[in-house]
Design a protein with these regions (language model features):
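Compositionally biased terminal segments of proteins
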Residues: 1-199
Length: 199
């Protein structure tokens, strides 16, 4: 409740316009065009509860388009297992809450798997957006050797295993996506070790 109140105070005081998109139980909020200087030009939120907006006076709500990346990520965050992983991975750096690299990779992997499945099912999903998540995960995997391991279980582990297997048969040119000094085999072995996928 305190966090929600702080968010709404920021939105109200900044004079933001409010937009929202909702589908399949997911809720995404975007606040733009603050009237007061010094406020972030955009705030984006993923809400676990669709009633987040209810009872808020002085907030105008208008529908916005939610693209594949946003709807996929919001759906992931609304999944209890991924939401718990998200909370587990938050750390504070210089007073700012950030998500550790070892926690970002599973989200990128899941977004890739979801968008790929939707595209294969016939949905109109841009192939470039599908590939982007995979490439992002592989770029970030270069940093996993410096991170502590994350013990993934259940669907989280299954999804990461599926991503690793997909990469094993894929044709990503690592040099072209900015990965230097590591082979695909080395990256995938690092992932397996980081996320407890060995054995």
């Amino acid at each position: 409740p305190q966090t929600a109140e702080a968010i709404w105070t920021l939105v109200r005081d900044g004079g933001y316009r409010c937009g929202w998109g909702e589908g399949k139980g997911s809720c995404f909020y975007r606040f733009t065009e603050p009237k007061r200087p010094g406020y972030p030009h955009m705030i984006e939120l993923f809400a676990k509860c669709p009633d987040f907006l209810k009872g808020r006076e002085g907030i105008d709500v208008a529908p916005i388009h939610v693209d594949e990346n946003i709807s996929s990520l919001s759906a992931i965050l609304l999944d209890d297992a991924y939401y718990s992983l998200f909370l587990q991975g938050i750390r504070t750096v210089g007073g700012v809450s950030v998500l550790g690299t070892e926690y970002i990779v599973p989200f990128k992997a899941k977004a890739y798997l979801d968008l790929k499945a939707r595209r294969e099912a016939g949905e109109n999903v841009d192939s470039r957006k599908v590939k982007k998540h995979k490439r992002d995960a592989l770029r970030l995997a270069q940093l996993l050797g410096e991170s502590e391991g994350v013990d993934l279980r259940g669907e989280l582990k299954d999804d990461m295993l599926a991503f690793v297997k997909d990469c094993e048969v894929g044709d990503v040119n690592l040099k072209q996506i900015g990965v230097a000094g590591a082979t695909m085999v080395q990256l995938l072995e690092t992932m397996k070790a980081t996320y407890g996928l060995i054995g």
